[in-house]
């Protein structure tokens, strides 16, 4: 079926910045690769380059044609194995060189982390529109944004718009979780226009092919669906192969049972047929298919906890042990692997999840949904989960799957997508700071300096969301002169601590009080003066009162 759509997407640079590129040479082919950055031009005359995920949509020199799709990047190789296999062979691929420039890391570090299985480069040979990126704990923490239609609402145009909107605000990957009509067509439009890797959960489309009845699923239907998606260019796929028949009873006394859609589908199939999941029994064949296209496994946590009460229970960790076994099998076949994690976990139980995943899964990159640190805030779960996300990322999680304010309530719209992405970029960056990631603090320092110097426009431009920062400032001080004023509406001109601090510093400079030695010298001189004055008055402690 042909779908005619004319999606309308946001283009143009983010406020206060422009698209910039760093040119590098692709190893082997010699092709020129353009590595993108968001360049913030500061009022001081300097500039600050930021990691950028927005693709050509923020480049004023690019004409966007959604029907034609994005241009293909050079250096794509289809017949020399996976990134894992090539890294093990000592090769630095074009994708690794691109990532090294993007992350400001050495290409050898990129290759070594991929070779060890501690990082993955989701880059299907059939998705040349994407800009290479890496997921691993040695690199900046990444954020995934889920989009996709449902049987109730949304359209292809809306989902393409959400994809562009999410990447504009910093989504490093996109997952198309469509479960409604036209799943193939929706995915095609997204893939051809996505500058970031795209992930899916193939069991959703396979279920559509059997009219929504999990018991009618077969390995053949699932396998053909996977190949269809590989051919389209899907970069990574969630596979719930760790949901085993014997684990299902472990969920019986849970407060919220099995909350993963894929997990519940496979549990229903196992119980109906009373045999092991076809994803588990055919896993090696699946590995060969993934390796053929260099599709990355995202081994799904189908038994993740959906409530604080169920956190870190027997079902969750039983599945994790099986995911560890499957990780070894996948890597033996040359397929890249990352591991999905929870879920709903109270703060004091979060770190245990990372430590166990690293132990059981050979330090494969951990990719977690939050986790939500409490269950009591529907409509604010982008906040409850960002708290858990920051903690788990500091502990070693490599990619965070965002949660929007609509979680548990409905399908997210454009505003929800942005709110979710921004909340998770905050969590990811906070974790990078805590881990001491190279260059992470440079942006904080640049913004803090601009704040102290009352360079309001520079503050806006360096922030995660320049539009909202400016909007909030304009609500009370909209005039242009306010953008250089040495105060804001919070404190006003007389109570601004930073202005007062500047006044103190100016006074100190004028009176030679800039160093500790200066201050000690002045204090000593003052004390000496008072000592002389005391002596001049006869060394008397009490002096007569004068009228």
Swiss-Prot record:
What Gene Ontology terms describe what this protein does at the molecular function level?
Answer: 4 iron, 4 sulfur cluster binding; carbon-carbon lyase activity; zinc ion binding
Query: In which residues is Zn(2+) bound?
Result: 344, 408
Q: Which residues bind substrate?
A: 146, 175, 204, 240, 260-262, 301-304, 340, 367
Q: List, separated by semicolons, the cofactors it needs.
A: [4Fe-4S] cluster
Identify the residues that bind [4Fe-4S] cluster: 488, 491, 496
Give GO terms for biological process: thiamine biosynthetic process; thiamine diphosphate biosynthetic process
Cellular component per GO, a single term? plasma membrane
Q: Which reaction does it catalyse?
A: 5-amino-1-(5-phospho-beta-D-ribosyl)imidazole + S-adenosyl-L-methionine = 4-amino-2-methyl-5-(phosphooxymethyl)pyrimidine + CO + 5'-deoxyadenosine + formate + L-methionine + 3 H(+)
Its family remark reads: Belongs to the ThiC family.
Q: What does this protein do?
A: Catalyzes the synthesis of the hydroxymethylpyrimidine phosphate (HMP-P) moiety of thiamine from aminoimidazole ribotide (AIR) in a radical S-adenosyl-L-methionine (SAM)-dependent reaction.
Name under which the protein is recorded? Phosphomethylpyrimidine synthase
Q: What is the lineage of its organism?
A: Bacteria, Bacillati, Actinomycetota, Actinomycetes, Mycobacteriales
- Name of the gene: thiC
